[in-house]
């Protein structure tokens, strides 16, 4: 681990249990669209493999993610393959 870059999947979905590498700004589970929580026991896991954002916090709401990135991660995923 270097600085705030965590090389492990650090967020776990509350609902479907999937663990994904994500950040507080876009931590929406693609599987079920629920907000995920960090699963790294307080390590600095703010780095996002998907969007590169590091906002220095571990949690977010879907509303925050939508405002920050202009839509949920799932929405952007399906737009990207359309």
Curated annotation (Swiss-Prot):
PTM comment, free text: Contains 6 disulfide bonds.
Keywords: Disulfide bond, Ion channel impairing toxin, Neurotoxin, Secreted, Toxin
Recorded domain comment: The cysteine framework is C-C-C-C-C-C-C-C-C-C-C-C.
Region (Disordered) location: 58-82
Domain of life of the organism encoding this protein: Eukaryota
UniProt feature coiled coil, ranges: none
Keyword Transferase assigned: no
Entry GO CC: extracellular region
Species per Swiss-Prot/TrEMBL record: Iotyrris olangoensis
GO molecular function, a single term: ion channel regulator activity
Organ and tissue specificity: Expressed by the venom duct.
Function according to Swiss-Prot or TrEMBL: Acts as a neurotoxin by inhibiting an ion channel.
Designated name of the protein: Turripeptide OL139
Localization per record: Secreted
């Amino acid at each position: 681990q270097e600085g705030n870059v965590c090389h492990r999947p650090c967020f776990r979905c509350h609902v479907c249990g999937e663990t994904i590498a994500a950040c507080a700004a876009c931590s929406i589970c693609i599987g079920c669209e629920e907000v995920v929580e960090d699963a790294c026991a307080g390590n600095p896991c703010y780095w996002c493999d998907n969007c590169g954002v590091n906002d220095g916090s571990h949690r977010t709401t879907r509303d925050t993610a939508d405002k920050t990135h202009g839509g949920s991660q799932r929405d952007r995923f399906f737009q990207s393959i359309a």
